[in-house]
Structure formats: structure tokens, C-alpha cells
């Protein structure tokens, strides 16, 4: 473990350390990135590989080996491991974890059982056919040959019935071993009856056999085919360890040849002579080597693919679980800031952006590239905009009275803590009273009921919420020893709800009724709920209601000008004589809401309630006895101690979700932090109002599992890996996919094609895509490396068969035929060339030239690969057939060997499992049928009656008559006897080849499908994470989210932060509710705010954070990310960027107005910088905001500013003027709370007093304009939140490099901004003329100005 100074050194040099472990070996890769000393210095990244540095065993010495530097990194040319997590024991392919190995054997058991039953069917069927054959052709030895075969058939039936028992599932390996030994015994016993003389004699001079018609027995080719079948079954379906299979196979081959040779020579087989005997023994041994090589290859690749498929399917299941968690976390995250209905529509936008991101990063193959259409899609007129009008909605505004006095003697950090505590109580009340929290504006809190989902009791919900807030603040004062109160206003009407902008969005409501609800709060009385006459109509007489007495308190002018005669009421509580239960009183009296859905569905994450004990039932009865129901809201309450809240904690006045136990936790209250056994997500996903802080912390725990594993010490790595494996096994055991996956593969049972046509096309192009992408080879299961092994085996078998064929000529001292030499040379060239190409594809593809790489990519295609594969898989058979000439008629040994070699060539068609099994099996059938045809073809050119060389060797009653006779003494043809045996022999062997080819292609396709499923789930998870990150970035800044993962709150003081307020000052003139309640007006505002948000996407403005939009006011700040400011160079560089952003906003409005045709928006910007506090407020509907005197002054710079110009304070002027900006001195302006302040305007007027052309007209009147959408000025919402801070200008920027600022330009205009007709631009039902709109706008503006009042503190 590195010491602390070493850790500091690594951190100082930005060193990245990763631990890569595979199997029993581990390695550490260290990446050192020295800090840049200057902007012109670009140090090269160096990577070093330190072997065995984190291995629990092995030497750790050795010098580091540099594997990359300034040049291109080269792929390590080494043999990959068998499969992921493979043990180091190559002779026994298994996982390095017993948990994984046992789970794999258990999950693959249906496939193992199925294959074993197929083997029993095959063996039993072979016994039946051989019994029939022996009964017909060996009547004199029925007992010797037929009875054992029939007895073994009965044994196979017994084994088959045994496979249905549970005992077989526990001892299937021992069952396979028992069957193997029985098959060995039966086939070796048959060797005693091979070539037994019946009624004939052997002519030793020419090695021919003359016999009279009699019974026949198995020939040498027939017995060797049985040996091949036994060995193939041993390696492919018996499921014994490799070392045991190899040992048994070698012993069987030795005994088989020993018994066969012994009894052939002892009874009737003539000795071929010393030289020929050595050739025969060596040739037979080499043929057995070929069979064992093919069997080992099939065994290893079968194990590799089954275990790789198990891991892939298991990973797919794990990814599926992770996908559920990610989806739940994403839903919780977005539902914590907005309602579900709005969130669903917003997520579609995130899905589209994620899909576009995937497409940008995807690598398409040439076949998948589609020709671009010449028809271009029509440009989208507007950005995605979701806003709906809802009637009968109650709106509540609440303001903390006395908050300014309370905050006067508190620090900013303490103030954020108080707001979190108080708003946390309000959030809980809002949740339980079924209200929808909208946001907080400074010390103001507002929510709605009946929106976005309508409710008939919306008025009661808001009244209960208001009364609960008054009760809650009383408790707050008692606990905190403070003197504050609540002033609440409620109004009922129609609202527009939705989201404005593309970044830092939040759910909000707009309408004149919202402004009126805000006015009700401002005209209310502390400690009471001030409601309008519209709200009172929805209430009954359960509340103590009195007249609002607005005239007596505020005067006649307020009622006449602002309320316009609207009658109001004050509610102080419920009537004492009524027995109604108040939600607020119940919540604040130690009761908790019982979720009906949770009760009906049982424990979280379960569909039915789990059975409990008698004590649990008694506790449930006791709980129901203490239930309370609020008649106004229909909400049921229970005491917190009885509502399942045990184990929860109270933070910020809000109780956490109860934690339930799971099997993996090991106890009712056990928890695993940052571990693999994190609580299931289903336990925490029922509450849509969960704190976003908890979501981020939970997301960090899930995401931190893999990070923690790579950084663990070597001594703990094994323990952590065991826990990971145990968790992996537990997850897949609960899923039925694994069992169905192997037992019911998603493929067509006849053609073996995938049922999904798109998946089939993808499968056929997968090999080519792997070559195109030059994917690294990690395991034997890789498609390119698997092909390399197939080509290597094909070359090996071809060379061995060719050598055995050429050995005969050395023994007989005869030259080989020219045709055989030519075929051998051509075949060898093809094999070597294929081997070189395969090695090139696997290890050296990045080094080939472009033309060669194109050729390799073409070869990797589906059709070329099958054509080349068909040739390669047939080369051994072609080599054997090239040696069949007329000479083989005269020698029994050569003829028998040739037939045996053809059998090996047929078995070789089990190679190349990536190719179609139909193609390989068909070619094997053709090769076998070719040998049978030789029985009817004479190689003698002078004879009209032909004779096969095998006929002369294998017919016991044939007498050699060279070139002119092939008829037996009794007149029968040779093929009439020996042909039937060979037909049966090749039929059984081809049947086994067809079966194995089918099984291994299915296995290969399942392995590919497992990869696809795992990648698909991994892509979905990544998409979910991208969406969550996208949401997170649009809710709170990224650096703030990282902090919230480890703490419940966030607040930070900044010494020099820049703040701007930009208001569309004449939006109230543009806004009118005559059509769709003003929805289309807000669509236009959404477009303009979206243009502002797009500016933030530019790299030049990445240091600017959008804070929020307040109606038609846009608020942004800079210098809030300390780490980013330190990397930027000068500490005040962010102020220049923020000022350039403000200038660019002016230009955006100018461009926007050029396309408006009939209305010009006017932007007014206020700029200031200085110390401020940034923090996150609330437990639900989190809001990232900034406070401080700097923010207050920036807001006043906006409200007291000039249209189409930027107003800055004197301190900001000093800094910006040194950066090269010219200002006009405005004079002194009366700023609320600050008195007279000197301000400056940008841009500077020209000599003739005219503002530059790109600016709009300047209004000489300085008017304080409040927000037209909610009736609150940006200054009012944040004024006096913190004690005044003495402002002083600090270090200024005096560099000469920035004497002339460069203005950013918009790169392109939006396509929808082309001049169009007014009726096309705004679909208000008819064309809107400028004059009529101006008339309507003036009337509406005058009405709005009467409703808007400044908030008094």
C-alpha cells in the first residue's frame, strides 16, 4: 500500500492507476500525466506495465516494460486465455472460482442432459442396426455378436430412464464414466471376432484371400469406424474432464490397436514384412492422433463456448438487473424535480439525444451503410415544447415573514442550513397533502394542487398545506429559538404548466391567476391563509373563515387598482366543533401517511405480501386500531413507530424510507455500504419525492462498485471477487432465462437460423465487423482466434494424413504418383496461406497495408468465408483420394488404411464450427458416398468388368484375377457382401457427424447471441446512464452533483462570482390569454430562451452556469466551479466570458426580432460581480441557487437598467474597462437597499450620441419592470436573503493582451427563422395584423401592470 506522501505525489502528477486481473494473474497499468507547465508544453503520455504487482502469488520483481510512448501503441502478441475468468489449468478448463464453476455446471445441466440422452439414442440405435446386420450375415455366430449388442441396447434404455431421476443430476459425471467404460468393454470385445477365418485361406505371396462362400465378420474399416465413434462420443458428450478424457481415449486407442493387430496376425492376417509392419503401425498411430486432435479441439472449444455463453448470459441478466436499477434511479431523479406526466415527455427528448449519441459513436459496417436519401426532411419550426392548460387549479404562495431580520446575524452557510431545514419540512407537507411543489424563490415557497393531474379536492389540499406550513414554522421557531412567521395566499383558476428552455429546466406554472395568487400572499396576514373568493367557492364550512379586510389594512386604492373588487377571506384553522382531522396536525403530531398502493402490493419490490409471524399479525391489528383518516383529503395516517418507519432517520425534518431486510444482507438491519450487496432498488423506488441527494449517493454506490474493486489491495481482492461471484450466482439463480436459454435456444430447429431475421443478418456480418474494427482478441471464443484454431487443426490433419499416405511409398520403395504430389503441393500452399492470413487477422491486422486489409475484410464476408472454409475443410479428404490408384488393389494393408484415412477425413468435417453445419455435413456425406462408389468402379482400364481395390481386400470369398475378373466363385459381385457393411459403417459415422455439427453450430450461435444480449443490455444501461447524466446536468451543475453523492447538503462561498440578469422587458405587452390561454406566447418565449441555452453549449461559454429563468428573466453566473477557474489562467477571466455572453444574448435577440415580423423584443441586462454563496435548497424539487449582496445588486442593475443595453456596477466597470470595454457613465441610480449607486452602460454611444446599429432603440425612461408571468421582480425574490457584505473591488486585470475584446459570433441561423407569414408563424387561427395586436397588447399590458405590485419586506 502506498504511503500518504506517495499518494500525494501521484495525485500531484495526475497519475492514473488501474488493476487488470484475469484468471490467476493480475497487472497494474500506471498512466502519468505531468501537469502542463505552460500552454505551449504538451508532455507525452507514457504507459508502463508492471507485471504481478497486485498478484497474490508469484514474483513481483522485474523492471517495468514500456509498452507505449509517443508513437502508436502496439497490441501485445500473446496467446489469449481460454475464456474470461479461466483458471490456469489448461488441461482442465474451468473457472477460477468454484462458485462460478458450480453455477455454470448447474445452469448448463439441461444441455448436458440433453446431449447425454442423444448419445444414448445413438449408441442404442447403432446396437440395434449392428444386431440386425450380424443376424443376417453371421448366422453361425448370432450368440457371439448379436446377443451382446442387444443386451447393451437394454443397458442404454436403463441409462436413459436413469437420466430422469434426481440421482443423475447429482452424479451425471459418474454416470458418463460408467457408460464410457461399458462402451469400451463392448467394442474391445468385438475385436476378438474381427477377421476370424471362416472357410478360406490367405495367399501370403500376394496378400490376397481366397475363400468359399461363408459368413463374414467386421472388416478393419468397420471396426475402425466404431473406434472413431467411441472416441468422438467420449470427447463431445460424456462431459468428463479433459485430462481424464484424454487418458481414457489414449488407453482405448492402444488397447484397440493391440487387440486388433494381435488377433489378426495370430489367426489369419499375414505378416506384411518388417518394413511394411512398421509403416502400418506408424500410420495407424497417426490416424489415432488425428482423431484425438479433432476430439480435443471439439472438447476445448465446446467448454470455452459454453462457459463464455454462461458468462455472457449471466452478464446479460446482471445488466438487466442493473438496467432496472438505472431506470428506477432515473425515474426517481426526474420525478424528484417534476411530475411524472411532464417527465415522460421530457424523457423522450433525452432518448432522442441518447440515440443520436449512440449513432455518432457507432461503427457501421459497409453492408449497413445505406444510401442517403435525396429527399431532405422538412425543418422543424419549433423546438420540442410541452405545455398544457389546466383549469380548476389552486395555487399557493407562502412567504417567510421576518426572514430578513433572522438572516441579519447569520453566515451564508448557516442560512442555507436553515432554509434546508425549513423547506424540508414544507416538502414533506407538500408530499403528504398531495400538492405539487413548483419551486422556491428566495424565501418564498409556492406549490399547486390539481396540476398536472386534476383533483376534485385541490382547494382543500392547498388549505391544508397552508395551515400545515404555519404549524411547521411554529415548531421551527420553538426548536431554533427564532421569531419568524408565514404569510400564505391561495387562489384558484387556470394555469399553463410545463417547462421553458433546454437547460436547467424545471416544472413551472404561468398565468394571470398565478399572479393573482402571488398577490394574495403579498396582501395576506402572517399566521393565516389568505384566499380569494374563487377558492372559497370550493370549500365548505369546516374552516374558520373571516373577511380579508384588505380595505381596512391597506386602503381603498389597493382594492380598486389591484384586486378590482375581488373579495378575499382569511382562514386561521378548522372549526373546533367539527371532528374533521387536519392533515397538517396529524403529520406534525407524530403520525405518518400510509401508502395505499404499498399496502395492497405487499413489501416493496414484491407482488404479494410475504407471510408473517403471529407477532406481526398482532402488530398489524394494533396499527389498524390507531389509524386516522382525514375526510378532506382521504389520507390515512398511523403512528410513525407503527407505520414501518423503524430503521429510518430524520434529516431536515423529513423521515427517510424504511429499510427492509433481504437474504443477502444477513440480518434485518444489516447494510453494506459501497459494497456488492447494495440494497435492492425495489426497496427504495416507491416514493417519487425522494431526495435527489439520496439518489445521487445511491447512484454513486452502485457506480462505485467497479471502481472500488480495481483499487482494492491484493490481499482483499480475492475476498471481494468471491463476494462478487456469489452475488452474480444469486442473481442468475433467480432468473429463468439461463435455463431456457440453453434448453430452448432462439433458433429455427431445422435451418438453425435465428428466429429474428435482423439478428441473423447481424450474425452473418459479425465476423467481418470484428475484422473491420480490429477488435482485440481476449479469449479463445473470439471469432478470429477460433478461426485461427480451426485452420491450424485443418493444417495439422492435412499434414498427418499426407505423411501417412506417403509413408507407404517409403516402405515399398515405389515412387508416389505425380497426381498425389501435385495435389499435396497445391493443398499445402493453400493451408499455409490460410494459416498466415488467419495469424495476420488475429495479431498483425493493424500493420497490413490498406489494399491487404481490404482483401482481408472481403475474405471475412459470409459468402467468401464459406467458400474458403469449404475448400479448407475438404483438403484432407482430397489429399487421401489423390493416393487411390490401381496399386491399392494388390495390397490389403494399403487398402484398409486408405478406407480408414477416408473415415478420418470425414470426421474432419466437424471442424470449422463457424460455418454452416448443413454445408459441412453435406460435404462429409459426399466424401463418404464417394468411397462407397469406389466399390463399383474398377481402376483397371482394360477391363469391362471393374473391381474396387477395397473389394479385393475385404471380400473373404474373392479370388484375385488381375484386370479381368471380379466375380466370386459362386458368381456374386464383391459389393454384394462388403458393400452392406460399409454402407452401415458410413451411415452411422455420418449420422454422428451430422449430430455433432448441428450441436456445435447451435453452441456457436448461442455464444454469439449471448454476446449480443449482453451488449444490448450494456447499451441500454449506458443509454439510461447517459439520460440520467443528461437530466442531472440540466438539474444541477455536474460538480455540485458529485458533491451531493457524498453529502446531504451543498453550499460554497465564492470570492468573485459574476452574475447577470437578462429580462425581456416588453414580454408583458406580447403576452395575452385570448388564444389557448397564452400557450403560443410562451412557445415563442421558449424559442428565445432556447437560443440563450444553445449559447451555453459553445466551448467558449463552458464556465457559465445557467441558474434559472424567472418568467421572462434569464439568470446566469460564472466563477462557480473553482477547479475550472483555476485551470482557466487569470482568476477574473470568467468575468470577461460572462460579459461576452451577455453581448451575445443581445445579438441573439436582434436575430430573433429579424424573423418576428410584427413584434420586437427588448432585452435588458444587469451585470455585477463579487462575493456570493452557492448552494442547493430543499429535499425534493432541488434547486441550485446563489445568494448574496452581489446577486441583489446584479438584479437591481437589471430592474433599473436601460432597454437593449448592459448596466454594470462601478466595481464591475473597473474590472471590465481594463479588459478593453468602453462604457457610458450613466450617473447615480437609486437602488433599493443600497441608496445611490454609480452605474455604467454598454455599449458606449458614438460621438453623435447614437448606439451602434446592431442595438435596438434605447428607452430614455428608467422604469422598474417586474416579471410579467408571476408578478414578482427578480430583486424581490432574493433581496435581503443574507446580511449585507461590504463590497470592495479586488485584484483587477491589467494585462495588455485583452485591450481589444473579440466578440463571439453566431455560427448559423435556425432554419425556422426564415421570414414567413404571421399566420404560419403563430397558429392563432387567423392572421394577426400588427395594428390589431398592438391594440390588444396595450389593453392587456395595462391590465397586467395594475395586477403587478412590488413585494414589501
Curated annotation (Swiss-Prot):
Location of region: Disordered: 1-27, 51-73, 349-375, 596-615, 641-685, 1290-1314
Basic residues biased stretches: 359-374
Cofactor: binding details: Binds 2 magnesium ions per subunit. Is also active with manganese (in vitro).
Reactions performed catalytically: ATP = 3',5'-cyclic AMP + diphosphate
Biased composition (Basic and acidic residues): 1299-1314
Localization terms from the record: Cell membrane
Annotated PANTHER family: ADENYLATE CYCLASE TYPE 1, ADENYLATE CYCLASE TYPE 9
Full protein name: Adenylate cyclase type 9
The organism of origin for this protein: Mus musculus
Amino acid at each position: 500500500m502506498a504511503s500518504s506522501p506517495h499518494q500525494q505525489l501521484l495525485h500531484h502528477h495526475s497519475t492514473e492507476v488501474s488493476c487488470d486481473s484475469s484468471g490467476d494473474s493480475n497487472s497494474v497499468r500506471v498512466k502519468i500525466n505531468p501537469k502542463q507547465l505552460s500552454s505551449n508544453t504538451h508532455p507525452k503520455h507514457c504507459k508502463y506495465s508492471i507485471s504481478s504487482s497486485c498478484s497474490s502469488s508469484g514474483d513481483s520483481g522485474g523492471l517495468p516494460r514500456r509498452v507505449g510512448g509517443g508513437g502508436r501503441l502496439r497490441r501485445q502478441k500473446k496467446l489469449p486465455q481460454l475464456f474470461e475468468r479461466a483458471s490456469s489449468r489448461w488441461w482442465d478448463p474451468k473457472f477460477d472460482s468454484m462458485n462460478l464453476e458450480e453455477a455454470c455446471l448447474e445452469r448448463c445441466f439441461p444441455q448436458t442432459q440433453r446431449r447425454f440422452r442423444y448419445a444414448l439414442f445413438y449408441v442404442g440405435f447403432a446396437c440395434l442396426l449392428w444386431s440386425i446386420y450380424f443376424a443376417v450375415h453371421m448366422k453361425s455366430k448370432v450368440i457371439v455378436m448379436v446377443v451382446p449388442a442387444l443386451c447393451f441396447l437394454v443397458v442404454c434404455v436403463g441409462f436413459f430412464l436413469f437420466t430422469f431421476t434426481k440421482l443423475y443430476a447429482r452424479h451425471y459425471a459418474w454416470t458418463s464414466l460408467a457408460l464410457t467404460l461399458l462402451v469400451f468393454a463392448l467394442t474391445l470385445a468385438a475385436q476378438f471376432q474381427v477377421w476370424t477365418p471362416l472357410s478360406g485361406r490367405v495367399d501370403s505371396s500376394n496378400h490376397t484371400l481366397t475363400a468359399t462362400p461363408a459368413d463374414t465378420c467386421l472388416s478393419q474399416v468397420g471396426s475402425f469406424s466404431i473406434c472413431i465413434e467411441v472416441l468422438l462420443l467420449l470427447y463431445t458428450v460424456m462431459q468428463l474432464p479433459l485430462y481424464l478424457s484424454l487418458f481414457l481415449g489414449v488407453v482405448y486407442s492402444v488397447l484397440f490397436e493391440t487387440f486388433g493387430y494381435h488377433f489378426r496376425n495370430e489367426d489369419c492376417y499375414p505378416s506384411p514384412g518388417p518394413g511394411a509392419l512398421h509403416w502400418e503401425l506408424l500410420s495407424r498411430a497417426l490416424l489415432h492422433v488425428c482423431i484425438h486432435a479433432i476430439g480435443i479441439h471439439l472438447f476445448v472449444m465446446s467448454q470455452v463456448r459454453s462457459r463464455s455463453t454462461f458468462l455472457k448470459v449471466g452478464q446479460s441478466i446482471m445488466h438487466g438487473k442493473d438496467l432496472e436499477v438505472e431506470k428506477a434511479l432515473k425515474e426517481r431523479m426526474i420525478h424528484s424535480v417534476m411530475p411524472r406526466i411532464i417527465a415522460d415527455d421530457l424523457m423522450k427528448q433525452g432518448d432522442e439525444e441518447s440515440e443520436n449519441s449512440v449513432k455518432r459513436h457507432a461503427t457501421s459496417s459497409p453492408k449497413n451503410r445505406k444510401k442517403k436519401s435525396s429527399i431532405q426532411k422538412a425543418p422543424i419550426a419549433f423546438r420540442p415544447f410541452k405545455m398544457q392548460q389546466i383549469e380548476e387549479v389552486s395555487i399557493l404562495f407562502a412567504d417567510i415573514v421576518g426572514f430578513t431580520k433572522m438572516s441579519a446575524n447569520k453566515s451564508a452557510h448557516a442560512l442555507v442550513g436553515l432554509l434546508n431545514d425549513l423547506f424540508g419540512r414544507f416538502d414533506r407537507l407538500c408530499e403528504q397533502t398531495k400538492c405539487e411543489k413548483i419551486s422556491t424563490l428566495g424565501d418564498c415557497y409556492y406549490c399547486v394542487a390539481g396540476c398536472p393531474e386534476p383533483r376534485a379536492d385541490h382547494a382543500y389540499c392547498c388549505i391544508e398545506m397552508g395551515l400545515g406550513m404555519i404549524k411547521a414554522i411554529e415548531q421551527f421557531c420553538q426548536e431554533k429559538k427564532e421569531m419568524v412567521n408565514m404569510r400564505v395566499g391561495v387562489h384558484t383558476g387556470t394555469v399553463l404548466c410545463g417547462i421553458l428552455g433546454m437547460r436547467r429546466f424545471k416544472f413551472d406554472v404561468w398565468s394571470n391567476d398565478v399572479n393573482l395568487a402571488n398577490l394574495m400572499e403579498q396582501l395576506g396576514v402572517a399566521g393565516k391563509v389568505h384566499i380569494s373568493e374563487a377558492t372559497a367557492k370550493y370549500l365548505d364550512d369546516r374552516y374558520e373563515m373571516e373577511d380579508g379586510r384588505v380595505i381596512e389594512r391597506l386602503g381603498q386604492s389597493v382594492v380598486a387598482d389591484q384586486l378590482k373588487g375581488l373579495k378575499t377571506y382569511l382562514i386561521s384553522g378548522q372549526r373546533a366543533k367539527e371532528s374533521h382531522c387536519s392533515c397538517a396536525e396529524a403529520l406534525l403530531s407524530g403520525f405518518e401517511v400510509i401508502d395505499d398502493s404499498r399496502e395492497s402490493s405487499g413489501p416493496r419490490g414484491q407482488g404479494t405480501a410475504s407471510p408473517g409471524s403471529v407477532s406481526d399479525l398482532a402488530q398489524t391489528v394494533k396499527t389498524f386500531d390507531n389509524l386516522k383518516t382525514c375526510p378532506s383529503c382521504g389520507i390515512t395516517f398511523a403512528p410513525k413507530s407503527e407505520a414501518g418507519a423503524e430503521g429510518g432517520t430524520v434529516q431536515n425534518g423529513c423521515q427517510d424510507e424504511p429499510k427492509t431486510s433481504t437474504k443477502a444482507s444477513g440480518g434485518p438491519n444489516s447494510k453494506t455500504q459501497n459494497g456488492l450487496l447494495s440494497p435492492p432498488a425495489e426497496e427504495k423506488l416507491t416514493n417519487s419525492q425522494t431526495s435527489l441527494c439520496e439518489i445521487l449517493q445511491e447512484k454513486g454506490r452502485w457506480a462505485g462498485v467497479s471502481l472500488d474493486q480495481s483499487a482494492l489491495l491484493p490481499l482483499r481482492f480475492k475476498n471481494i471477487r468471491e463476494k462478487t461471484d456469489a452475488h452474480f450466482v444469486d442473481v442468475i439463480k433467480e432468473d429463468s432465462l439461463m435455463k431456457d436459454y440453453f434448453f430452448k435456444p432462439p433458433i429455427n430447429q431445422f435451418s438453425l437460423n435465428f428466429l429474428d431475421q435482423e439478428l441473423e443478418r447481424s450474425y452473418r456480418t459479425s465476423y467481418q465487423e470484428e475484422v473491420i474494427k480490429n477488435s482485440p482478441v481476449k479469449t479463445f471464443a473470439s471469432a478470429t482466434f477460433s478461426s485461427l484454431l480451426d485452420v491450424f487443426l485443418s493444417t495439422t490433419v492435412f499434414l498427418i494424413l499426407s505423411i501417412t499416405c506417403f509413408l507407404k511409398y517409403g516402405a515399398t520403395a515405389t515412387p508416389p504418383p505425380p497426381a498425389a504430389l501435385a495435389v499435396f503441393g497445391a493443398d499445402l500452399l493453400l493451408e499455409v496461406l490460410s494459416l498466415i492470413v488467419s495469424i495476420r487477422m488475429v495479431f498483425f491486422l493493424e500493420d497490413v497495408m490498406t489494399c491487404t486489409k481490404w482483401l482481408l475484410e472481403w475474405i471475412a464476408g459470409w459468402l467468401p468465408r464459406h467458400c474458403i472454409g469449404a475448400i479448407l475443410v475438404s483438403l484432407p479428404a482430397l489429399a487421401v483420394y489423390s493416393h487411390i490408384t490401381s496399386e491399392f488393389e494388390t495390397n490389403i494393408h494399403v487398402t484398409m488404411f486408405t478406407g480408414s484415412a477416408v473415415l478420418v477425413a470425414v470426421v474432419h468435417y466437424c471442424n470449422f464450427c463457424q460455418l454452416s453445419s448443413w454445408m459441412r455435413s453435406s460435404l462429409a456425406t459426399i466424401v463418404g458416398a464417394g468411397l462407397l462408389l469406389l466399390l463399383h468402379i474398377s481402376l483397371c482400364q482394360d477391363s469391362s468388368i471393374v473391381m474396387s481395390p477395397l473389394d479385393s481386400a475385404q471380400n473373404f470369398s474373392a479370388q484375385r484375377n488381375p484386370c479381368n475378373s471380379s466375380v466370386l466363385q459362386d458368381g456374386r459381385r464383391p459389393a454384394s457382401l462388403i458393400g452392406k457393411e460399409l454402407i452401415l459403417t458410413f451411415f452411422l459415422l455420418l449420422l454422428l457427424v451430422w449430430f455433432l455439427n448441428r450441436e456445435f453450430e447451435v453452441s456457436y450461435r448461442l455464444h454469439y447471441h449471448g454476446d449480443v444480449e449482453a451488449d444490448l443490455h450494456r447499451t441500454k444501461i449506458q443509454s439510461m446512464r447517459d439520460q440520467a447524466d443528461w437530466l442531472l446536468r440540466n438539474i444541477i451543475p455536474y460538480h455540485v452533483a458529485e458533491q451531493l453523492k457524498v453529502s446531504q447538503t451543498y453550499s460554497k462561498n465564492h470570492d468573485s462570482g459574476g452574475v447577470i440578469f437578462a429580462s425581456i422587458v416588453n414580454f408583458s405587452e406580447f403576452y395575452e390569454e385570448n388564444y389557448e390561454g397564452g400557450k403560443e406566447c410562451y412557445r415563442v418565449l421558449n424559442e428565445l430562451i432556447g437560443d440563450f441555452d444553445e449559447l451555453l453549449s459553445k466551448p467558449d461559454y463552458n464556465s457559465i452556469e445557467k441558474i434559472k429563468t424567472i418568467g421572462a428573466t434569464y439568470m446566469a453566473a460564472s466563477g462557480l466551479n473553482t477547479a475550472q477557474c483555476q485551470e482557466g489562467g487569470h482568476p477574473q477571466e470568467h468575468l470577461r466570458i460572462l460579459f461576452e455572453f451577455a453581448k451575445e444574448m443581445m445579438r441573439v435577440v436582434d436575430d430573433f426580432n429579424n424573423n418576428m415580423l410584427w413584434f420586437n423584443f427588448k432585452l435588458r441586462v444587469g451585470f455585477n460581480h463579487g462575493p456570493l454563496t452557492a448552494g442547493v435548497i430543499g429535499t425534493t424539487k432541488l434547486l441550485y441557487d446563489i445568494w448574496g449582496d452581489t446577486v441583489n445588486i446584479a438584479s437591481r442593475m437589471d430592474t433599473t437598467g436601460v432597454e437593449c443595453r448592459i448596466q454594470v456596477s462601478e466595481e464591475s466597470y473597473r474590472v471590465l474597462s481594463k479588459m478593453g470595454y468602453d462604457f457610458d457613465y450613466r450617473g447615480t441610480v437609486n437602488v433599493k437597499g443600497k441608496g445611490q449607486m454609480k452605474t455604467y452602460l454598454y455599449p458606449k454611444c458614438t460621438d453623435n450620441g447614437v448606439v451602434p446599429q446592431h442595438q435596438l432603440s434605447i428607452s430614455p425612461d428608467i422604469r422598474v419592470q417586474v416579471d410579467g408571468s408571476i408578478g414578482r421582480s427578480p430583486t424581490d425574490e432574493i433581496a435581503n436573503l443574507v446580511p449585507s457584505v461590504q463590497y470592495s473591488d479586488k485584484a483587477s486585470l491589467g494585462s495588455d493582451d485583452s485591450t481589444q475584446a473579440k466578440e463571439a459570433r453566431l455560427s448559423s441561423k435556425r432554419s425556422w427563422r426564415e421570414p414567413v407569414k404571421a399566420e404560419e408563424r403563430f397558429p392563432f387561427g387567423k392572421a394577426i395584423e400588427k395594428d390589431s395586436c398592438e391594440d390588444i397588447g396595450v389593453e392587456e399590458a395595462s391590465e397586467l401592470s395594475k395586477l403587478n405590485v412590488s413585494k414589501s419586506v
